[in-house]
Regions:
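Short, structured active-site "lid" loops
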Residues: 51-76, 240-280
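Residue-level recognition of beta-strand->loop/alpha-helix junctions
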Residues: 7, 38, 160-161, 229, ...
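Conserved active-site segments centered on acidic
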Residues: 192-261
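Glycine-rich phosphate/pyrophosphate-binding loop and the adjoining helix
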Residues: 136-194
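A short, gly/pro- and small-residue-rich
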Residues: 94-108, 146, 262-264, 270, ...
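N-terminal beta1-alpha1-beta2 submodule of the flavodoxin-like/Rossmannoid cofactor-binding fold
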Residues: 1-107, 111, 175-195, 210, ...
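Phosphate-binding/catalytic loops
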Residues: 127-134, 277-323
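Short, glycine-/small-residue-rich phosphate/pyrophosphate-handling segment
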Residues: 94, 110-155
């Protein structure tokens, strides 16, 4: 379970940061891995409205923090938290730049017809504070957040907002903040109790990525689908991405990782190996299954499709048996 917090306030340790820390802390106490991103520290080129992402599926900017990191984190996340103070009834510039650049993800879904496998289950929360008490104080932010979450492939699950909060440290004196956080997070509670299945192959570039993608798309509400490799490649296999795109599944912005890193972050209930069983660590209480599947890397596109289809069938049966 991975929760991504986006801290949109220019203040490093203000009320927004306190509220986000409370939310992330509650997620961590329930077993999630958490990460907080300070938007003010990111280098994000502003969207120019060029339309390239609508034609090609990728932004023209390839060397800033959105391209190198943020797209990957957004699609890795099970829960995305968008936290920010109100600036002129909307978001401050640093986090607004991140929101605007999510248009590239929107384009992949609504222009190219590809769906990130986490989209059906990913949850989004907005956290905000404002200095005034106007009835419509958060309306602009709420609408922006709703469309940002849709672009990033998340449902707009809930919002936690506070009026008449301005001075640093003021929210800490507000009664009931931690109760409000817990109440909101209950709407995502089923995600914290899913069974964890780790799919592992040698390079974490083809087979394990496809298996995790199919499992997440099919049963992400019941299964936390993890993936890793014994000797991970530097990046996922582009031919695998093309084969999955033929099924309408978007495998862009995927990273590889070691088996050791995966199990250190979250102990799986089941490990499914595909050619790397001898290198998987023994973990007491964890079940193991080995799928004898050939490595399609370096083979023909048709062979990649055959392995993809076999993995899809096995995942379908695994979900039926296990979840």
């Amino acid at each position: 379970m991975y929760v991504l917090g986006l801290q949109g306030s220019p203040r490093a340790k203000g009320n927004t940061n306190f509220l986000l820390d409370a939310f992330l802390g509650e997620c961590q106490s329930r077993g999630a891995a958490i990460e907080k991103i300070q938007a003010r520290r990111l280098h994000v080129e502003p969207c120019t409205g060029c339309g390239t992402c609508e034609k090609k599926g990728y932004c023209i900017f390839t060397d800033d923090d959105m391209a190198r990191r943020m797209y990957f984190l957004l699609w890795r996340a099970d829960v995305v938290i968008l936290a920010s103070p109100v600036y002129f009834y909307n978001f401050p510039a640093p986090i607004k730049a991140v929101i605007d650049r999510s248009q590239a993800l929107w384009s992949r879904k609504y222009k190219l017809g590809l769906e990130d496998p986490g989209r059906p289950w990913r949850q989004g929360f907005m956290l905000s504070v404002g200095a005034t008490k106007g009835k419509n104080l958060f309306d602009g932010m709420s609408l922006t957040a709703r469309y940002f979450f849709d672009a990033a492939g998340a449902a707009y699950t809930d919002a936690v907002t506070y009026r008449r909060i301005e001075a640093a440290g003021e929210l800490e004196k507000q009664p009931g903040v931690f109760d409000d956080v817990k109440t909101a997070l209950e709407k995502a509670a089923p995600l914290f109790s899913r069974k964890k299945i780790l799919f592992a192959c040698r390079e974490n570039a083809c087979r394990s990525q496809m298996a995790a993608g199919f499992a997440r798309q099919r049963a992400g509400d019941r299964i936390e689908a993890l993936h890793a490799g014994s000797t991970p490649a530097d990046r996922v296999n582009p031919q695998m991405q093309e084969a999955m795109a033929e099924k309408g599944i978007d495998m862009a912005y995927r990273s590889t990782r070691t088996i050791a890193d995966a199990v250190a972050e979250s102990t799986p209930d089941l490990i499914v190996t595909m050619g790397c069983g001898e290198q998987c660590p023994y973990i007491p209480g964890v079940s193991y299954i080995d799928w004898d599947l050939p490595d399609p890397a370096g083979r023909s596109a048709e062979f990649m499709r055959q392995v993809r289809d076999e993995i899809e069938q096995r995942v379908r049966q695994l979900v039926s048996d296990y979840a």
